[in-house]
């Protein structure tokens, strides 16, 4: 397995020490790519530095293209980790708190060029790999049915990770699952907000209901972010500045990046609808197995499983709602976007499968503490 990428807010290492003495641009050409991009994101005077060295941007982009070749053509594990770690840092600029100095670089031209290079190459690679074709004359109902077939027939529906969590995993392994699940779960409110931007009027009621449920239906303590944070506190994980993204391998980072790519690029908005639909369809049955496993190892007495219990029940409704009230009317209005929705669905199924397989292997490799085996 590739080295895990630490997507920290501050890059580290000798080259970064040089950068602190003024050699930021030079350091960015020698650091591992994810550290280089994190360093640039944190450089508040990046515009001025790049303006003073007009040839530097092309050198950085050449380096990015080289890393992309290794990652997407050669499927080099470390290069995949570098690319997705860099992309994660770039997307963090779009959701970071406005008081953070790095927020000034949200639309930095050089960083935007890097992001667009990675996005185009990744989408092109995934498009060739998945080869999703839209029907010649799509209508909303047929696309909704196609998504349900894709979901029900995909191997990820019965992924062995969740059988393992239900029947065999130790408490330590289940807690490691929670930690790995953190970055996306704690970001999901923002992702739903992105889905509401520019939404068709027919879809707004369903999207608003999803957001209302995510926000706790008026009770802040029941918001999904707070429910999940309560779970982390009870099991001793607690909060982290990066929402524990530092534990993710490239597969986990790619799953997060998949959402963000479709969120921040209006041209890919309809891919987001397919990604979201699959997420709502997958969660209930898998989370039911997870909750069974949690209770098997003694969790649940402090209400800490409410986050997953909630998704077992409401995501059944949300899954049908996404298909019937969001995707169906939108495809009926604009049949040409059916291909993007189907691609998003297939893409999410594939990324979940890869992430679950990598996480399953990592959990199996954890040492089981004495007395923790089921």
Predicted features along the sequence, with ranges:
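Non-heme di-metal
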Residues: 2-374
């Amino acid at each position: 397995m590739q080295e895990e990428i630490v997507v920290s807010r501050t890059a580290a290492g000798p080259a970064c020490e040089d950068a602190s003495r003024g050699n930021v641009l030079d350091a960015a050409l020698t650091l591992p790519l994810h550290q280089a991009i994190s360093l640039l994101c944190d450089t508040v005077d990046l515009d001025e530095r790049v303006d003073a060295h007009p040839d530097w941007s092309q050198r950085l982009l050449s380096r990015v293209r080289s890393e992309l070749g290794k990652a997407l053509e050669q499927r080099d594990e470390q290069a995949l980790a570098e690319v997705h770690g860099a992309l994660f840092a770039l997307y963090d600029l779009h959701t970071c708190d406005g008081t953070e100095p790095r927020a000034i670089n949200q639309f930095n031209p050089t960083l935007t060029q890097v992001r667009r290079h990675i996005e185009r190459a990744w989408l092109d690679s995934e498009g060739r790999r998945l080869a999703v074709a839209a029907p010649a004359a799509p209508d909303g109902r047929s696309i909704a049915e196609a998504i349900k077939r894709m979901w029900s027939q995909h191997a990820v529906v019965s992924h062995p990770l969740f059988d393992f969590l239900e029947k065999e995993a130790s408490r330590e392994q289940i807690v490691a699952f929670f930690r790995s699940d953190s970055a996306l779960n704690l970001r999901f409110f923002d992702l739903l907000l992105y889905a509401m931007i520019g939404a068709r009027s027919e879809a707004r009621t369903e999207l608003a209901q999803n957001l209302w449920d995510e926000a706790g239906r008026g009770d802040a303590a029941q918001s999904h972010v707070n429910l999940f944070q309560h779970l982390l506190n009870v099991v001793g994980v607690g909060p982290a500045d990066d929402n524990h993204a530092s534990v993710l391998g490239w597969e986990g980072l790619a799953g997060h990046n998949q959402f963000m790519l479709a969120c921040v690029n209006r041209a890919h908005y309809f891919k987001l609808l397919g990604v979201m639909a699959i997420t709502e369809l997958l969660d209930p049955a898998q989370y039911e197995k997870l909750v069974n496993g949690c209770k098997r190892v003694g969790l649940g007495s402090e209400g800490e499983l409410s986050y997953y219990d909630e998704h077992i029940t409401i995501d059944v409704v949300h899954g049908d709602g996404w298909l019937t009230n969001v995707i169906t009317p939108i495809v009926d209005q604009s049949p040409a976007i059916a291909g993007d929705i189907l691609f998003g669905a297939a893409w999410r199924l594939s990324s979940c499968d890869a992430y679950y397989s990598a996480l399953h292997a990592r959990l199996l490799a954890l040492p089981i503490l004495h007395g923790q085996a089921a």
